[in-house]
Amino acid sequence: MTTHEETRAPAAPRNGAAGAGGWPGVAAITASLFVFLTTELMPIGLLTPLGESLDVSVGTVGLMVTAQGVAAGLGVPFIVAWTRRVDRRKLLTALLGVLALGNLITSAAPNYPLILVTRMVMGFASGVFWAIGVSMAMRIVPERHANRAAAVVMSGISIATVVGIPLGTLLESAGSWHTTFLIWAGLSALALLAVAVTVPSLPSANAVPVREVFGLPVRNGSLRVVLVMVVFFVLGHFGAYTFVRPYLEERASASVGFVTVVLIVFGFGGAIGNVLGGRAVTRSLRGGFVEGGLLLIGALVLLLTVGSDEVGVIAAMLLWGIAFGVVQLSQITMTLAAAPETFEAAMSLNTMAYNTCIALGALVGGLFADHTGVTSAVWFGIVLVGLAVLLRSVTGRTTASAS
């Protein structure tokens, strides 16, 4: 069984650059990532008002993240394989159509069960986007700019956390959560139009049948290790991050305005982390992940110790964002490096693990929040991220060898 350890993601199979070097299409795909991610994580900034409006607990509202994550995770390997003959531009526009309609339904939904079902349907679309989006961007620019295109698309994560989620919180405070989701339905429709106009026709890249997708971790030891690390990391991070708002409201008596500031600070930290992560993974994939993970643990410990000190909270959230940016880029690069010849299938498995664990992290964090207090959700994050770092530390030296 052959394993791989590389410091760069492999170049994607090409279909020729689009007009203007393909960069308008890259921008459209980045905008798509923005609306997909903000839609998925929007409830994190709206837990309290959603719970009050729908008359459910904070932990129950957290299931909105859980439902979308479960659907995204469990459905993506099958949908990517089943649509391997579908033009990727057509597929992406269809996914954005589902997202726009889902946000529209959510904005007008009269009850929580309808919202939950709608989130699950949107989750299927979100999962497929994560599996195909980056590779699409890499293929529509000249080959020498492929890695740069991937980095631009991934910057959508930072944009979403800096602007999107805090903006959703701000819009809710100025109006209502209904208005927030209605606006996001419009943004999803605009992203759909941008993709339709700027992204060229693209066949699937290295897609394989379903049975081969699930056989990849069996045959590829490096990919198997990376996927387990993703499980631990995402469980820990989102188990804690999903409940940032109620944690700050309980421990620091935080206002909506301060929570918004904190989320923006976290997003800026993520942007810094993306830059630092790019340098770290070029030097060492293992080192980048371990360093980012240790910094994240330190940030969570700091958050627990500063109490109601607003400066301390901001510092902790900035460090948390930086760490998240480093680890996020590291785990994606490790996935692509572990399976360069089947990267679309490998990314579908990564997406399955990642989104399922967003869901499980929110679920377990919600159980802790409801039964033992929101502080325990932060401790849960520390333990699980620690397991991810430990696994990477003890396996990183052996993944380059053949077994």
Show where each model-derived region lies.
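Cytoplasmic helix-loop-helix junction between adjacent transmembrane helices
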Residues: T118-I157
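Helix-breaking motifs and short loop linkers at transmembrane-helix boundaries and internal kinks
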Residues: D55, D87, A108-L114, S253, ...
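Juxtamembrane intracellular "pre-TM" segments in multi-pass secondary transporters
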Residues: P10-G21, T198-L227
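C-terminal transmembrane helical hairpin of 12-TM major facilitator-type secondary transporters
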Residues: G287-Q331
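Helix-loop-helix hairpin linking two adjacent transmembrane segments in secondary transporters
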Residues: Y112-L114, P142-V199
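Paired small-residue
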Residues: G102, P113-M122, V311-L319
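Helix-to-loop junctions at the C-terminal end of transmembrane segments
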Residues: G75-R88, G273-L285, A369
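Conserved MFS/SLC helix-loop-helix module at the cytosolic interface between two early adjacent transmembrane helices
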Residues: L74-P113
